[in-house]
Regions:
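Positively charged n-region of N-terminal signal peptides that target proteins for export
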Residues: 1-5
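Bacterial N-terminal signal peptides
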Residues: 9-17
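Bacterial lipoprotein signal-peptidase II cleavage site
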Residues: 18-31
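Short, solvent-exposed loop/beta-turn-alpha elements that line the ligand-binding surface or hinge
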Residues: 61, 134, 210, 276-284, ...
Length: 316
């Protein structure tokens, strides 16, 4: 009887030891540092949640390092993505189509929430879109900016071929040329659009008014396959930043946002924060509208459906 009791005690001790060792192994495994993610952003409000997440330490809380690279033009951003200098980027559906058309696979992992406005210069004497015929509009060609410009102009029953588009890829340069009267109008993202308004520009229309926003977050196929846990961590941090933005006033974070994003100082008095929501996916309808525009301009002949060029698993 005593032998049986001793044997039982020994078994229990060994079992506890094994469980303890297993727990330690699991703990050590789960605490392994995640790989670094590098993402590209533009000078717009789509980037704000990522800047907040980095500054407030939300990425670190999720066990991830995120390097944020700032770009002034979509072409520079796309070149960096193709060269492997960044893993993902705040982008748009047009770029996704172009990348995949050229056999460089990228995946949409969520939509982004920015705002774009068509602004007329202070001395242009343009107060409505109908007066844009024969006038110059600063854009970046074959990007979300040109897409939105066309949609905005056509919403007023104006033939977009009757306006003079001027390709100005770098957004700060476009803003400067508008303010200096070198172009009559420009399509700009917020918060730079509000900067133009504060300088005397006038809002003719906006993506918000039309209810369209083809902005998306994308990652390369390699990143999606090799950094899935890191991307999930990024989105958990992103949602923490959204909560912060909903609860805090801009005065509490405007200083470091101006510094980190490279926004002009005038943004301090004009920043209007969108009503951000937790990470979610774009719709099939939004993709179809982009494809129709691209096909009309003979920029693609391919048909895509959202599930083939996206991965929603990171935000679930």
């Amino acid at each position: 009887m005593k032998k049986n009791i001793l044997l039982l005690v020994l078994v229990l001790i060994l079992s506890i030891g094994i469980v303890g060792c297993t727990s330690e192994v699991k703990k050590e495994t789960s605490s392994q540092p995640l790989k670094t993610l590098t993402i590209g952003v533009m000078p717009d409000l789509d980037s704000l949640p990522f800047i907040i997440a980095e500054h407030n330490g939300y990425f670190k809380e999720e066990g991830i390092q995120v390097k944020i690279e700032h770009f002034k033009s979509a072409s520079d951003r796309d070149t960096a993505l193709q060269a492997g200098k960044i893993h993902g980027a705040i982008s748009d559906m047009l770029s996704v189509v172009f990348f995949n058309d050229n056999k460089f696979e990228v995946k949409i992992t969520s939509k982004t929430e920015g705002s774009f406005k068509l602004i007329s210069g202070k001395d242009s004497n343009i107060s409505k879109i109908e007066q844009s015929v024969g006038k110059t509009i600063g854009i970046s060609k074959n990007t979300i900016i040109e897409y939105l410009t066309d949609r905005i102009v056509e919403s007023s029953k104006i033939d977009v071929n009757l306006v003079k588009k001027v390709a100005i890829p770098k957004i700060p340069t476009r803003l400067e040329m508008l303010n200096n009267g070198k172009i009559d109008m420009a399509t700009l993202p917020e918060p730079l659009a509000s900067t133009a308004i504060s300088a005397g520009g006038k809002v003719l229309s906006s993506s918000d008014k039309l209810g369209i926003n083809p902005g998306v977050m994308i990652f390369t196929k390699d990143a999606v396959e090799s950094k899935s846990e890191e991307i999930k961590s990024l989105y958990r941090a992103y949602n923490k930043a959204i909560k912060f933005l909903k609860e805090e006033k801009p005065e509490s974070y405007i200083d470091f946002v101006i510094k980190e994003a490279g926004f002009p100082e005038s943004v301090r008095n004009t920043l209007t924060v969108p009503n951000y929501s937790d990470a979610s996916m774009p719709t099939e309808k939004e993709l179809t509208e982009v494809l129709n525009w691209l096909k009309t301009k003979k920029l693609t002949t391919n048909n895509y459906i959202l599930k083939d060029i996206s991965n929603s698993s990171f935000i679930k």
